[in-house]
Amino acid sequence: MSIKGQVTSFAERVEIGERWAGGQSDREIALALQRPLPTIRKWRRRYQQEGRDGLISLMGRPATGALGQLRGEISDEILQMREVHAGWGPLTILTELKKDARFGGLRFPSRARIAAYLKHKQKVKKYEHHQELPEPPHPTLQRPHQEWEVDAQGKIAIAGVGSASIVNILDVFSHVKIDSLPCLRTTHANTQDYQLVLRRAFVGYGLPEQISLDHDSVFYDNQTASPFPTVLHLWLIALGIGVRFIHQTPPAEHARIKRHHQTVTQQALLGQTFAGQADLQKALTGRLLFLNTDYPSSALQGQAPFSAYPQAQQTQRPYRLEWERESLNLQRVYTYLAHGRWFRMTSSVGTFSLGAQRYNAGTKRARQTLDITFDPQTGELVCLPQKESTSFRLAVQGLSKEVLIGELDPLTTIPAYQLALPWSRQAWRESVLCLDLGDTTL
């Protein structure tokens, strides 16, 4: 239960009203939101009597301010403490004030008054309404390629090529090692790296039903409590692949892919020196073939994955790079986004960010929380400002096939595309993709 005296956000008040309208009792709402029952009752009544207009808080002291009756030295010291020690809360600041000999004999503000003053001076952290992304449930696995686990091993030192981050893909049910991709000269694989290894996997095996991911920033927006899907996430959705995020740290979830990282290191890397990136990739591919075809797995009663599950050598959904543009279905993305909801605070000039895109709500809506949903029929964001009862619409940005396809687009749409020497990461990725393209002359 939250501490008495904390202030509810506008998004929380909206949720209180909507939960009440949906049939939940005050006590059920208090338990779900971890807020005191009187707080729930207060805002539920406001919503019941006045609708959304009643949810705008009019809290605050008169113009004198939260510490208007106290000497300026104390208020100045409170601000100074908070600026120097951002982690100090009202209770810590009050305790430090009482120890300061300069303020001996003066009347001190209460902890609540200090909290109100810091809020008035905008020296407190803004708490956002938490809204999870829609996702499929954790499946009961019954067949190969029902779910792949995808994860990067992290930075490791490899003799001959330096440091690398290796991205691995594993089919959970059959234990087939799908692919491994070394990303050199980086500690963190990016969106294009993951698209490359996934495309290689799709070419080799076809499209899986579902992929599970952790909360790495490439997959998931960790900077907000109501995240918008990343480009990689939307690309998979457009291809008709379900995306599920793990909700427990390994080994509770993703234990297999973590063990697979160790297997790849032991089988392909330890004690080896490589002439370059192509040599390293060849070694990884060769050992994965050995593990899938020959190596007896204890989890499969001593059989290799392809022996235990011959059908795992190909999914039911074939894929080619040349087909990707036509395979991408933006309506799948629109349908997915229609189940989402996002809360964003506008800036002093009325702008806000959503999905790495910048939008302008207008200066009259500056410093307000927007309650945002998506209309799949028009492809627009529907924005309801905190201080208004009427929504407005903005055209969504960054949802074209060109944006989702990324580096593959020029390779498949331009009749003659001259590859650069593979000295940069992008040039190397393009050269790898071309190996899987039909009618390509290298």
Model-derived regions: residue spans:
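C-terminal, beta-rich DNA-binding module of retroviral/retroelements integrases
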Residues: 292-442
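Short, amphipathic alpha-helical "recognition" segments used to contact nucleic acids or chromatin
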Residues: 8-24, 75-84
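Basic, flexible linker segments flanking DNA-binding modules
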Residues: 55-150, 155, 311
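Mobile-element integrase/transposase regions
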Residues: 68, 72-73, 116-178, 189-197, ...
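Short, Lys/Arg-enriched anionic-surface-contact patches
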Residues: 1-14, 65-72
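Short alpha-helical "recognition helix" segments of helix-turn-helix
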Residues: 29-33, 93
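RNase H-like two-metal-ion nuclease catalytic core shared by retroviral integrases
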Residues: 213, 222-266, 277-280, 285
